[in-house]
């Protein structure tokens, strides 16, 4: 602008707007069967599904580019480009599990089980560009991306519980095998596969000190896996 705020070299307006959505879908089914001879002996079958789809649709637009006579030069020199981004992501997980518990005598309990988890992370982001002031959007490969990340997780666990007077002792372990598949459909990045396993020990100890007093301690470990 000039000193009188009336003359100017160039000017333009920008408009940024968009909309998005986020959902959480969860469900589970359990079936449990108890032994007629011993009510503490039971087997449980479980299924669980979780899904978290998200969308994002945004625009950045240049408007009222002036002076009109120099409009194209302004667009070229300042690299003014409208863009439209249309993105979708989702993390979906299905879990199948079976658990078995049985007492051995009055003091001992054995727990064992197995689990299969199928986890699918996906991201699809389409990017479009148009010359400033134009709505002729063209899909741009260089700035778009599409990505898939699959995990197949198989695990088994075993645990033992000893209850004697005011003492409760629970050691156990869990073994997990993960098969990972990553694929870049659009955008930079190389597809890769990975397999790895983990052995996770756990232990807890509880002591009853009185009618309202308990002392507890333990060790456990959780495994965190990448999402989107």
Regions from the language model: what does each represent?
Residues 1-228:
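Primarily recognizes Gram-negative and organellar outer-membrane beta-barrels
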């Amino acid at each position: 602008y000039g000193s009188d705020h009336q003359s100017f070299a160039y000017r333009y307006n920008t408009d940024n707007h968009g909309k998005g959505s986020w959902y959480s879908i969860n469900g589970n089914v359990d079936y449990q069967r108890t032994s007629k001879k011993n009510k503490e002996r039971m087997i449980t079958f479980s299924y669980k599904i979780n899904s978290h789809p998200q969308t994002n649709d945004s625009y950045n637009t240049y408007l009222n580019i002036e002076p009109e006579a120099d409009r194209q030069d302004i667009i070229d020199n300042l690299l003014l480009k409208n863009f439209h981004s249309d993105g979708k992501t989702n993390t979906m997980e299905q879990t199948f599990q079976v658990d078995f518990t049985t007492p051995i005598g009055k003091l001992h309990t054995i727990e064992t089980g197995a689990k299969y988890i199928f986890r699918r992370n996906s991201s699809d982001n389409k990017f479009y560009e148009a010359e400033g002031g134009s709505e002729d959007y063209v899909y741009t490969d260089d700035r778009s991306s599409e990505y898939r990340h699959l995990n197949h997780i198989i695990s088994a666990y075993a645990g033992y519980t000893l209850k004697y007077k005011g003492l409760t002792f629970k050691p156990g372990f869990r073994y997990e095998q993960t098969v990972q598949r990553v694929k870049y459909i659009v955008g930079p990045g190389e597809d890769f596969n990975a397999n790895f396993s983990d052995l996770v020990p756990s232990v807890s100890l509880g002591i009853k000190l009185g009618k309202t007093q308990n002392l507890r301690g333990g060790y456990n470990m959780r495994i965190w896996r990448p999402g989107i």
